[in-house]
A protein has these predicted regions:
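Sec-dependent N-terminal signal peptides of Gram-positive bacterial secreted proteins and lipoproteins
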Residues: 4-30
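Residue-level detector of conserved, function-critical positions
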Residues: 30-390
Length: 390
C-alpha cells in the first residue's frame, strides 16, 4: 500500500540568509548563523528544513515552529483540508502534530495516510509481525478495526479494502458494502463503478456488486461513464467498449490515450507511433508522431524527432516542432517547456508569457499558477507575475 511517501516532494534549494537586519526580502528569510537547509517551501509561510538527517518546520521569518528532531516531516496538505497539520516520524513511528508542535495523533503508527475529512488510514504490526491497517479519527479513535492488509483512499463514497488476499469495499460510514472477494481493484473508480479482477480477468462492478462489464479483459485502463466509454485490453491489444460492453474501437492498438468521442478524435499508438482515429476507427491523422495529446481549442500537441509542436485537425503543422514538451490550449494559451523552463504561447506560436518559470499550470479564469525561484503565485495574460502573500 502506498503510504505517506505518496506525497510529492520538490527539489531541495538552499535558504537565503538575511543580509541586513530588519530587511525582509521576498520569500523565506533565515536568521544569521542558521545552518539548516530547505527541503520544501510550501509557498505560504511554512518551510520544511533539515539539519543532518533531522527535519522540522520554520516560518517565513526563520523561526522554528516544529523542532528539527524528526526523521520526516510532511504537511497534511490535502487541498481540501488546509489545516496546517504535519505528519511526523520519530523512532520509526508516525503521528500528527499541529503548527505549534502539539501532538494530535500520537507517534505510534508504522504509516499514516489521509483517508477523508478528519480521518486517517494507519498501520501497525501485530504480535506476529504482520502489518494491519485501520482507520482512526482526529481524536485517535479507531473507527475501522486493524484487520485489513490494505485500505485505500475514499473516493465517491466508497473505498477498496483488502482482507487476507481478497478485496472488497467499505462506504463513507466505514460499513462493508461489498465483502472481500476480488483478486485486485484498480485505481479506476468512476461515478459509482469500479474495475476489479477475478480469476485473472478484469470487469466492472457497481456499488451493489452488480457486474456491469463481464470479467473478460486483461486490464481496464480507463473508465469514463459520463462519456460512455471504457478503454480495455484483450490478448495484448487495446480497444474501446461502451458501458454495455459493445465494442466501439476494435482491439488492435498498442495503447489508446486521449479520447474525444464527441468530436471524433482518439489518440492511439500503433507500432510505437502516435496517430488519431475517429469513432468509426478510421485513421484521420496518420501514425507518424512520437507523442500526441488531446485536441483542445482546435489544436493538438504532437512530437517529432524529440520536439513538440501543434497540428490542426487536417494534420497541418500550425506551430513548429521546437519545444521540449507541450500541453493543451486553455483560454487561448498553451503551456510549453523549453530549456527546463515553462512559458505560454498563443495559437500562432507567439510567446505570451516568457520561459522563466520552474513549474506552471494551464490558464483558468485569466491566470495560471506558476513557480519561480522558490516563489509561488499567478501570472496573467500580460505576463505579469503576482506572488502569493505570506
Amino acid at each position: 500500500m502506498d503510504t505517506i511517501q505518496k506525497v510529492f516532494k520538490k527539489l531541495s534549494i538552499f535558504l537565503v540568509f538575511a543580509m541586513v537586519i530588519g530587511l525582509m526580502t521576498p520569500g523565506v528569510v533565515l536568521a544569521k548563523n542558521k545552518d539548516y537547509k530547505v527541503e520544501l517551501d510550501y509557498g505560504d509561510g511554512y518551510v520544511t528544513v533539515y539539519k543532518g538527517n533531522k527535519y522540522g518546520i520554520v516560518n517565513d521569518k526563520g523561526k522554528i515552529i516544529i523542532p528539527i528532531v524528526y526523521q520526516e516531516v510532511i504537511r497534511d496538505d490535502i487541498e481540501y483540508t488546509l489545516r496546517y497539520n504535519f505528519f511526523v516520524k520519530k523512532g520509526g513511528k508516525w503521528g500528527l502534530v499541529n503548527k505549534h508542535n502539539k501532538v494530535l495523533i500520537k507517534l505510534q503508527y508504522d504509516s499514516i495516510q489521509w483517508y477523508g475529512d478528519k480521518h486517517y488510514i494507519v498501520s501497525k504490526k501485530d504480535k506476529r509481525g504482520y502489518v494491519n491497517y485501520g482507520i482512526i479519527n482526529f481524536n485517535n479513535k479507531a473507527v475501522l478495526p486493524f484487520k485489513y492488509s490494505d485500505i485505500r483512499e475514499l473516493y465517491g463514497g466508497w473505498a477498496p479494502v483488502k482482507k487476507g488476499k481478497k478485496y472488497g469495499f467499505i462506504n463513507d460510514k466505514f460499513k462493508t458494502i461489498i465483502k472481500p472477494q476480488y483478486d485486485f481493484v484498480s485505481t479506476y473508480l468512476s461515478d459509482g463503478y469500479a474495475s476489479v479482477a477475478k480469476s485473472g480477468h478484469y470487469g466492472v462492478i457497481n456499488k451493489k456488486n452488480k457486474v456491469i462489464i463481464p470479467f473478460e479483459y486483461d486490464s481496464i485502463e480507463q473508465m469514463n461513464f459520463d462519456d460512455g466509454y471504457i478503454i480495455a485490453s484483450k490478448s495484448g491489444k487495446t480497444g474501446i467498449i461502451d458501458t454495455k460492453n459493445k465494442v466501439i474501437i476494435p482491439f488492435e492498438y498498442d495503447s489508446i490515450g486521449a479520447v474525444d468521442l464527441e468530436n471524433g478524435f482518439i489518440c492511439a499508438i500503433k507500432s510505437d507511433k502516435y496517430g488519431y482515429i475517429n469513432k468509426e476507427n478510421k485513421v484521420v491523422i496518420p501514425f507518424e508522431y512520437g507523442g500526441g495529446n488531446k485536441f483542445t481549442e482546435g489544436l493538438a500537441g504532437v512530437s517529432k524527432d524529440g520536439k513538440w509542436g501543434f497540428i490542426n485537425k487536417d494534420n497541418e503543422v500550425i506551430i513548429p516542432f521546437e519545444y521540449d514538451d507541450a500541453w493543451g490550449f486553455s483560454e487561448g494559451l498553451a503551456k510549453v517547456k523549453k530549456a527546463d523552463k515553462y512559458g505560454f504561447i498563443d495559437k500562432t506560436g507567439k510567446v505570451i508569457v516568457p520561459f522563466e518559470y520552474d513549474d506552471a499550470n494551464s490558464f483558468s479564469d485569466g491566470s495560471a499558477y506558476v513557480e519561480k525561484g522558490g516563489k509561488t503565485g499567478t501570472v496573467d495574460k500580460n505576463g505579469v507575475f503576482t506572488p502569493y502573500e505570506d
